[in-house]
């Protein structure tokens, strides 16, 4: 892995990536944490940092050197609403990438963070190697009222920006695959309900790849934090579960779906993915589920464990079914 003997602080302090460095993990000041002074080799021993972070940072440097990589939507769409939402552009070197859907990548973080460091840049680098252009979305978190509605607006703003700049990015703006992790996995699923693409008159994704996603409010039977529910949904959880926030009950608008998770997930019950898969099967929507025997929550690119290479398998599956679509 590149930079394995460099500290995280030195790598994120590189002036080339100054606009994005503070959002390596949005809403966390990493410079105040012990991991700031750890090398990437040392970080790999910690579960949530086990992926190929060095490859992601190397690819980020390469993108930054082009000068055509970082797009704060508050600036580019001239919106009076200041949200801090932005996309980072990782183009693939594959000449056929222009003809393929781009990947719209949404890292997770429990709706309080956005983990670009592990679930954004390294994953985008892998999709680039598979011949796909990638946009990485950094979205609003820590909302106090209807955050998920705001996140759907984040999606719409980003996708409209991309569609409006097809020539600049050498792609077809109406052809895209969504991929999201954990909370980001919930968002890419929610985008396929009536709250998502249809509400914004935007095209349906070609496919969706949720990775260890939350999908169901009814599965979360623990004690409810009313402030959290109001911040996410604008209502209490029981009321939200009667709406399309309960994704398996509103799955008719989904594209083909490939789900990836680990059996030993300690944070998100694997039943979230299985429940969605059963709902898609009832709708006769193509779906596969890959459940790793190990890896837990937050395995990201799956390096060093049984989930390694899942991005390639997702693409291979998508290409196998797209030939028949």
Regions inferred by a protein language model and the residue ranges of each:
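N-terminal cap/lid segment of alpha/beta-hydrolase-fold proteins
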Residues: 24-98, 223
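Catalytic nucleophile-loop/oxyanion-hole region of alpha/beta-hydrolase
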Residues: 115-122, 135-173, 302-309
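Primarily recognizes the serine-hydrolase "nucleophile elbow" in alpha/beta-hydrolase
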Residues: 157-224
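Mobile cap/lid helix-loop segments that gate and shape the active-site cleft of serine hydrolases
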Residues: 213-249
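Short beta-strand/loop motif that positions the catalytic acidic residue
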Residues: 253, 259-261, 265
């Amino acid at each position: 892995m590149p930079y394995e003997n460099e500290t995280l602080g030195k790598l994120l302090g590189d002036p080339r990536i100054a606009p994005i460095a503070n959002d390596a993990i949005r809403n966390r000041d990493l410079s105040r944490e012990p991991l700031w002074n750890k090398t990437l080799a040392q970080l790999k021993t910690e579960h949530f940092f086990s992926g190929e972070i060095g490859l992601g940072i190397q690819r980020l440097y390469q993108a930054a050197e082009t000068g055509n990589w970082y797009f704060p939507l508050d600036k580019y769409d001239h919106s009076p609403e200041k949200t801090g939402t932005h996309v980072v552009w990782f183009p693939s070197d594959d000449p056929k990438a222009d003809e393929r859907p781009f990947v719209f990548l949404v890292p997770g973080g429990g709706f309080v963070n956005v983990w670009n460091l592990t679930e954004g840049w390294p994953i985008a680098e892998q999709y680039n190697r598979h011949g796909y252009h990638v946009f990485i979305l950094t979205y609003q978190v820590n909302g106090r009222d209807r955050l998920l509605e705001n996140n759907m607006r984040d999606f719409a703003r980003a996708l409209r920006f991309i569609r409006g700049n097809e020539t600049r990015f050498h792609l077809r703006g109406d052809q895209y695959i969504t991929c999201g992790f954990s909370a980001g996995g919930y968002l890419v699923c929610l985008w396929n309900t009536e709250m998502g693409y249809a509400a914004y008159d935007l095209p349906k994704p070609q496919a969706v790849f949720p990775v260890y996603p939350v999908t169901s409010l009814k599965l979360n039977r623990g004690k409810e934090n009313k402030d959290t529910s109001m911040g996410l949904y604008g209502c209490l959880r029981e009321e939200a579960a009667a709406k399309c926030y309960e994704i398996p009950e509103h799955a008719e608008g989904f594209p083909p779906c490939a789900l990836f998770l680990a059996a030993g997930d300690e944070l998100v019950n694997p039943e979230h993915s299985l429940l969605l898969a059963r709902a898609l099967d009832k709708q006769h929507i193509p779906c596969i589920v890959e459940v790793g025997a190990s890896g837990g929550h937050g395995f990201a690119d799956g390096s060093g464990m049984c989930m390694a290479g899942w991005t390639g398998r997702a693409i291979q599956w998508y290409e196998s079914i797209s030939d028949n679509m």
